[in-house]
């Protein structure tokens, strides 16, 4: 299992652009209608919609009773299903933690791996309920990285995302994580992906920021390599 130095399943997407008063600061027992309306109000602005889904996932980590009631009241809701699938991935990652793989207990790693297939299944179910929504595909890309999908499998998932939203910010960030050297790629593959995103970005898109994430990822790894070299050098003297 490759390691990640970031807490959770990867970098966050843009902050929702709604005013603080319109965001659900909490979802107390059974109060799911505000959450449903909050996501629905984003319409087909898929980046904004995903940002709202991410916020609901965070709220559900504290108390998911409202989410269960939402799903019970509207089992056909793709939004509720997407929040649930993302929550499952986040909970799996919370058990694994952000430490290097060799520092994660075998029990935690086993539980992490055992939870991920269910999260992937939940994301597929969400995509069937909301076939036009790229959100479930972001969840799939996140889970696929930890499930060790090969390059072909992952590329097919990413193609599914792009069919729905070719410039989706969070989807590209998850893909960048997959292609970086600490997971299933290399520096070359990571930069190739980032350059393609940069070249494809339409005017005004935030997608060129993916390249900045690649530079940051490379810088962090270079810094860790330098620290390791310095420690080895000091140990030899």
Go through each PLM region and give its residues.
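Short coil/linker segments at helix-helix boundaries
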Residues: 45-73, 87-126, 132, 136-163, ...
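Extreme N-terminal leader/anchor segments
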Residues: 1-74
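Beta-sheet entry/capping signal
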Residues: 77-79, 168-170
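Charge-dense polyanion-binding interfaces
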Residues: 205
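Extended, hydrophobic/aromatic-rich amphipathic alpha-helical segments that build helical scaffolds
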Residues: 78-90
């Amino acid at each position: 299992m490759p390691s990640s130095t970031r807490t959770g399943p990867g970098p966050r997407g843009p902050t929702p652009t709604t005013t603080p008063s319109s965001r659900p600061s909490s979802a107390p027992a059974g109060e799911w209608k505000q959450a449903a309306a909050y996501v629905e109000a984003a319409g087909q602005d898929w980046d904004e919609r995903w940002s709202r889904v991410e916020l609901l996932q965070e709220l559900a980590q504290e108390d998911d009773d409202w989410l269960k009631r939402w799903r019970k009241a509207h089992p056909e809701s793709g939004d509720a299903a997407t929040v649930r699938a993302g929550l499952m991935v986040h909970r799996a990652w919370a058990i694994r933690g952000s430490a290097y793989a060799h520092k994660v207990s075998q029990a935690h790693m086993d539980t992490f791996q055992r939870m991920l297939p269910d999260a992937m299944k939940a994301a597929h179910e969400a995509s069937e309920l909301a076939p036009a929504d790229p959100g479930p595909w972001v969840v799939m890309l996140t889970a696929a990285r930890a499930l060790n999908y090969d390059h072909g499998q992952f590329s097919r998932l990413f193609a599914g995302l792009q069919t729905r939203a070719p410039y989706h910010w969070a989807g590209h960030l998850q893909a960048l994580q997959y292609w970086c050297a600490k997971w299933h790629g290399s520096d070359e593959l990571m930069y190739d992906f980032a350059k393609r995103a940069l070249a494809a970005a339409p005017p005004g898109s935030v997608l060129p920021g993916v390249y900045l994430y690649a530079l940051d990822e490379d810088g962090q790894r270079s810094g860790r390599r330098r620290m390791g070299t310095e420690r080895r050098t000091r140990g030899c003297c």
